[in-house]
């Protein structure tokens, strides 16, 4: 056990022998009846379309690596499972491990060659970076900062649904931070764009890594100021004010979207405040 957590992100050296390995491709992981972690040396002896291998951390003190595969090939007695499945169900420590491994795998896939001169990139031992030996370009794992906000109006909250959502589910508003703006400016702009209302008195609540594929969600509460709801065409299927005692189906418990809603409910009712997962 490492500290109080079973999973600890890190960079175990690929030159060392042994450990566990995850096989990843297109945000899916290979698994069999024993789970997702395979003996590293055994899996590497299989005929795999390997693109890259990276150390990603330790599980119960043992080093863990990710093999990024070119395609999700079929192996006897094994199947591919989507990352999102582990977010919704099962062990949260395991989901954190898989989310990190997926982001590193995607980064390795997308940065095999230099975007400046086309030379094959090389992983560095001293930090998590791909470097071009020809022109020196550095590429770090990508993070895309996004705001997510619950707009409130007393005992009402503004919730919306995208055409991509599970039928019937409503959630908070979210959007990516654009170049040149602060996260707070992004909150005001995205709310205005998505539902046509103005907000103020922003309160930062917390953040959550969201590996679909590489977002960092920064969560807020914001108070309604003015305006009528006008859903953004092609982005928002429906948006409504909901009373706290008559909420629609909501996002998964582990999501920061659900946490923003549950936290506001707790504060209005005087109940104990929930803890943000992760």
UniProtKB/Swiss-Prot annotation:
Q: Where does Zn(2+) bind?
A: 114, 117, 132, 135
Taxonomic lineage is:
Bacteria, Pseudomonadati, Pseudomonadota, Gammaproteobacteria, Pseudomonadales
Report the cofactors. Answer: Mg(2+); Mn(2+); Zn(2+)
Listed binding positions for substrate are: 84, 127, 140, 208-215, 257
Assigned EC number: 3.6.1.-, 3.6.1.22
Its recorded name reads NAD-capped RNA hydrolase NudC
EC supergroup of this enzyme: hydrolase
> What does the record give as the function of this protein?
mRNA decapping enzyme that specifically removes the nicotinamide adenine dinucleotide (NAD) cap from a subset of mRNAs by hydrolyzing the diphosphate linkage to produce nicotinamide mononucleotide (NMN) and 5' monophosphate mRNA. The NAD-cap is present at the 5'-end of some mRNAs and stabilizes RNA against 5'-processing. Has preference for mRNAs with a 5'-end purine. Catalyzes the hydrolysis of a broad range of dinucleotide pyrophosphates.
**NCBIfam families assigned to the protein according to its UniProt record, in alphabetical order:** PRK00241.1
A single GO cellular-component term from the record reads: cytosol
Give the encoding gene's name: nudC
Residues given in the record as a divalent metal cation 1 binding sites: 174, 194, 235
């Amino acid at each position: 056990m490492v500290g109080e957590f079973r999973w600890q992100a890190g960079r175990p050296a690929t030159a060392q022998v042994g450990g566990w390995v995850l096989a990843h491709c297109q945000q899916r992981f290979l698994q069999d009846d024993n789970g997702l972690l395979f003996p590293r040396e055994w899996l590497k002896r299989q005929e795999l379309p390997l693109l890259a291998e990276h150390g990603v951390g330790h599980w119960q003190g043992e080093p863990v690596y990710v093999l990024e595969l070119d395609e999700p090939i079929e192996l006897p007695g094994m199947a591919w499972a989507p990352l999102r499945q582990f977010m919704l169900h099962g062990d949260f420590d395991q989901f954190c491990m898989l989310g990190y491994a997926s982001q590193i795998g995607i980064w390795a896939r997308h940065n095999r060659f230099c975007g400046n001169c086309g030379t094959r990139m090389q992983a560095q031992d001293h930090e998590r970076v791909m470097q071009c030996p020809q022109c020196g370009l550095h590429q770090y794992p990508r993070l895309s900062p996004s705001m997510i906000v619950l707009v409130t109006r007393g005992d009402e909250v503004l919730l919306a649904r995208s055409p991509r959502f599970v039928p019937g589910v409503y959630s908070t508003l979210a959007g990516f931070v654009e170049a040149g703006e602060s996260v707070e400016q992004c909150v005001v702009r995205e709310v205005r764009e998505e539902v046509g209302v103005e907000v103020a008195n922003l309160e930062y609540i917390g953040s959550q890594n969201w590996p679909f594929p590489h977002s960092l969600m920064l969560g807020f509460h914001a108070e309604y100021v003015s305006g009528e709801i006008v859903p953004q065409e092609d982005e928002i299927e429906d948006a409504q004010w909901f009373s706290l005692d008559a909420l629609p189906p909501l996002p998964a418990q582990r999501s920061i979207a659900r946490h923003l809603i549950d936290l506001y409910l707790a504060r209005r009712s005087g109940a104990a405040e929930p803890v943000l997962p992760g």
